[in-house]
Amino acid sequence: MKNLDITKGLVLLVSALFFGCADGLDEGLDIEPTGAVSETVYWSTERDAELAVNAVYNELDNTQSVIELDGITDIGFRSASNVPTFNDVRLGEIDPSNGTITGIWERYYRGIRKANDVLANIDRIEDGDPATLARLTAEARFLRAYYYMQLSSLWCNVPLILEPLDVNDQRPTNSKEEIVDFVIDELDAIIDSEVLPLSYNNDNLGRVTHGAALATKARIAIRNSKFELARDAALAVMNLGIYELYPSYQGLFQAEGQNSSEVIFDRQYAVGGSTYNNFGYSAASIGGNSTVEPMMGLFNKYEYIGPENPDDPYENKDPRWNYNVFYTGQPIGNNIYNSWPTSDTPDRVSGSEWATLYGYNLKKWVDYETYVDNPDLGDVNMILIRYADVLLMYAESKIELNEIDTSVYDAINAIRQRPTVEVPVITEGKTQAELREIVRDERVRELAFEGLRLFDLNRWQLGEEKVGLLQGMYYIDESSGEWEILDYGQVAKFNPDRDYCWPIPQKEMDINDVITQNPGYTN
């Protein structure tokens, strides 16, 4: 049961009432307002506060910024058929007018605006349980900090706004360091208060927990090379003793794995409420439009766990490759996936709107058996933080601090030895440099298409890995009979002096006279 439906119409109605405009209204509101609701009347009860905080959750990362964000890195390709600005980012052709980055910027700042409204008004409520109101306050503070973490990771320098603004107010850009310090301070205050519970009952699944605050602190710390903070926060999550790896890697991203003990924080979709097309990002043969395509960069990250077969490059690969990617020869629905140029199926590589361009298709997040009768009713939650990530952050922090001990190997090997994965363990005796490479590769193998690859490449200063010829699937060329790698001559660029920080959107520059554009971009 999943009752925190963060995209339902009532949530957006709250936003429309108090921020001057609606972000879009779904059908089927929980209430029918009979007239305008005054601010004085609204901030009266505990239920008012809960609805307002629910509105803050509404701006959490969705399928776009979880699945699609990996499509602008070395491991993926975001189809240009309906949102060409995503592909522009992938190719290194980014500018302040890019619609993709503008949309992400606006969503995070909507969340911040809503959180600021909660924090400015919640103390006015007299009719409510003090403990519940304190928890709701902590939730709003956490979500605001989460949005600022994302903004600082993508744009680096952004305005820090902590109170409701008048329409004419303008705020200058704050440095990335100021934003990061604010986020860590906020998370520390929330963690130290112990207001957030370790878990919730079924009526409140999806709300922020104490563990989520600790895990988010580890994430913001490791993104900014604060390895001692990251180590300690990750260890604190581990020591809670309430999280564990879900046995089925593939099942974790399907209906069976929802709300499992591996999930620390996610964007919830409610049964009978807000949904999305569960097949939409995947193959044409099951009704998808190949929105995000895995690329050769991902294939190359997965190890061979048995002899490499020159007659079949897919044989003996890490099982997570099979769980994450549809490639020719794999079952798909009631058929066999075949995207080779000679295929007579809808999945044949093509420049059409629905077919894959480079040959591979996304399998992660696709739950065929559950949604085969109506994929539009997909309600698989978008996992934002999970325990495997915490283990890898712990291991990486210890490696960077040169505190290499058995616990580092244990953390990595727990993931590699997950039932249904069971790839060989990493044996002890590795150097710091060797372990650094191991944990970085393990992150992409484990966390592919969970919206983390771009952040990892940026914090490691490895943006150049996105550079070069875009390469898709292995296939047998009909004329030569040899295995080939598909490409169309598309080349991605990366400017290390500019592209680690996205440009402030042009729309923002046009209305804010005191904001400063990031270096390297012209308006």
Residue ranges of predicted features:
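Conserved, well-structured interaction surfaces
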Residues: 45-54, 58-64, 84-155, 169-178, ...
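Bacterial Sec-dependent N-terminal signal peptides
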Residues: 1-33
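C-terminal substrate/ligand-recognition segments
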Residues: 325-415
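Alpha-helical solenoid repeat scaffolds, predominantly canonical TPR units
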Residues: 114, 179, 186, 233, ...
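Long, intrinsically disordered, low-complexity segments
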Residues: 21-23, 65, 83, 95, ...
